[in-house]
Amino acid sequence: MRMRYKPWAEDYLKKEPNIVDIDGSHAGRISEWFDNDQPIYIEVGSGRGQFITTLAAKHPEINFISMEREKSVMIKVLDKVIEQGLTNIKLICNDAIELNDYFKDGEVSRLYLNFSDPWPKKRHTKRRLTYQTYLALYKQVLKDDGEIHFKTDNRGLFAYSLESMSQFGMYFTKINLNLHEEDDEENIETEYERKFSDKGSRIYRMEAKFH
């Protein structure tokens, strides 16, 4: 369900410049923004932020970036960060296509893609976050041993992503064809994931690296 547009969202986000980058002011100096040398994990398309804020709370030794282009959605993430007093998470309000403007080559240790828009129509293939254009960006910002963790309830997108990544020269270290049936204790659910798994939807997951 698409969140209703909130005309006041931009002003709300601008009140927390130490947490939120809405204008590219921290582009190219993300590590300096955190002011430490901890590993950086990114979630592209964070939605309401349940996944990444839960992860950040569990792992204070890691720096997290929530990248979400919709300002009306990002305010939900910001509220969670403030309410939980998290200091190891920053928010970037921009599109994934701008990744290499924000991150230096090899600066990121892990990238999460959770329940991305499947863009099912063939003419929209290039918009999928596992299309080769995006994979090239991920390869650039990830460390040599960096990982992509991907989850979806869309079988078509999962199959496409496996093929797209394979053709790009990636390999898979883990593939789950029914995540919740396997009872993975390390799994952290997104809001979307909980909603659809409760309805019996199968959740697909994989972890991948570049050769």
Curated annotation (Swiss-Prot):
The protein's annotated pathway: tRNA modification; N(7)-methylguanine-tRNA biosynthesis
Catalytic activity entry: guanosine(46) in tRNA + S-adenosyl-L-methionine = N(7)-methylguanosine(46) in tRNA + S-adenosyl-L-homocysteine
Key words, A-Z: Methyltransferase, S-adenosyl-L-methionine, Transferase, tRNA processing
Entry's Gene Ontology molecular function annotations: tRNA (guanine(46)-N7)-methyltransferase activity
GO CC terms, sorted: tRNA methyltransferase complex
Repeat among keywords: no
A Pfam family assignment: Methyltransf_4
Binding site for S-adenosyl-L-methionine: E43, E68, D95, D117
Catalytic-site annotation from UniProt: D117
Binding site for substrate: K121, D153, T190, E191, Y192, E193
Domain of life: Bacteria
Residues in coiled coil: none
E.C. number(s) listed in UniProt: 2.1.1.33
HAMAP family listed in its UniProt record: tRNA_methyltr_TrmB
Role: Catalyzes the formation of N(7)-methylguanine at position 46 (m7G46) in tRNA.
NCBIfam families documented for this protein: PRK00121.2-2 (NF001080), tRNA (guanosine(46)-N7)-methyltransferase TrmB (TIGR00091)
Protein family membership: Belongs to the class I-like SAM-binding methyltransferase superfamily. TrmB family.
Protein name: tRNA (guanine-N(7)-)-methyltransferase
Provenance organism: Staphylococcus saprophyticus subsp. saprophyticus (strain ATCC 15305 / DSM 20229 / NCIMB 8711 / NCTC 7292 / S-41)
Gene that this sequence comes from: trmB
